A protein has these predicted regions:
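Conserved beta-strand termini and adjacent loop/short-helix elements that scaffold enzyme active sites
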Residues: 33-35, 93, 161-163
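Conserved nucleotide-sugar donor-binding
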Residues: 106-121
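N-terminal anchoring/stem segment of glycosyltransferases
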Residues: 1-61, 116, 216-218
Length: 225
């Protein structure tokens, strides 16, 4: 995860803890990055060098990135379950339902395999940061890569999964945000994109109470806050 420090004082403390609890239960490694690699571009781009940094250690076969405003909800599902369904070195979810077809993919969560082709694509994607300075930033660039609109970048190594595989359809998360008395759909990941801080604080504190048992909270960052 990449998160700016100011958000950790707000709703992000809940999402970090929810996700860290999922990671701990499944014996994965969890990395929280809070310092930008290039402060001249928006935070949305920082996920790319964060993943490249982890691959430099040559410790991981796969790295999964998830946005700060997204959480692992159905915690019985394993990341390997997704990996085994798709052939691409990079797996990402569609954003067509959320953007009326404008963007092919959503950059809020992606799974990357440690292969030369995937690492080269991440490097080339990062190099586009000064060319895609308007919304949707890195997501727009990745959508163009998927559609093979950028010379010299092979988008064929990317598998595009449905929105609800490990991301969200906006209408679903918006419905839950409007009425948290009813549970959200039982999805692997819920991504509460394009919502204000007050809404996210309410939603994530509610989901934190649901997903993180009290006896597990001693392991998490909010225990010290």
């Amino acid at each position: 995860m990449y998160c700016t420090p100011n958000l950790l004082e707000k709703w992000a403390k809940y999402t970090v803890d929810i996700n860290k609890n999922y990671i701990r239960k499944n014996s994965y490694d969890f990395h929280l990055i809070t310092k930008p690699f290039d402060a001249s571009v928006t935070h949305a781009w920082q996920k790319i060098p964060a993943m490249l940094m982890l691959f430099q250690e040559n410790k991981y076969e796969y790295v999964m990135y998830i946005d700060t405003d997204a959480i692992f909800y159905d915690q019985t599902i394993k990341i390997e379950d997704i990996i085994n369904k798709y052939q691409g070195d990079i797996i990402v979810c569609s954003d067509e339902a959320n953007s009326a077809g404008k963007y092919k993919v959503n950059g809020g969560a992606l799974i990357v395999k440690n292969t030369p082709a995937a690492i080269e694509l991440l490097i080339r994607w990062w190099e586009l940061r000064n060319e895609y300075k308007e919304f949707a930033f890195e997501q727009w660039a990745l959508s163009d890569i998927v559609e093979n609109k950028i010379d010299g970048i092979d988008g064929s190594i990317i598998s595009v999964a449905p929105e609800t595989e490990f991301n969200s359809v906006y209408n679903e998360v918006q419905t839950y945000a409007n009425d948290t008395s009813k549970p959200p759909p039982n999805r692997f990941v819920h991504h509460f994109m394009a919502m204000d801080d007050k809404t996210r604080e309410h939603v994530f504190s509610k989901l934190y109470d649901e997903l993180v048992p009290e006896n597990d909270r001693q392991y998490l960052i909010s225990a010290g806050k």
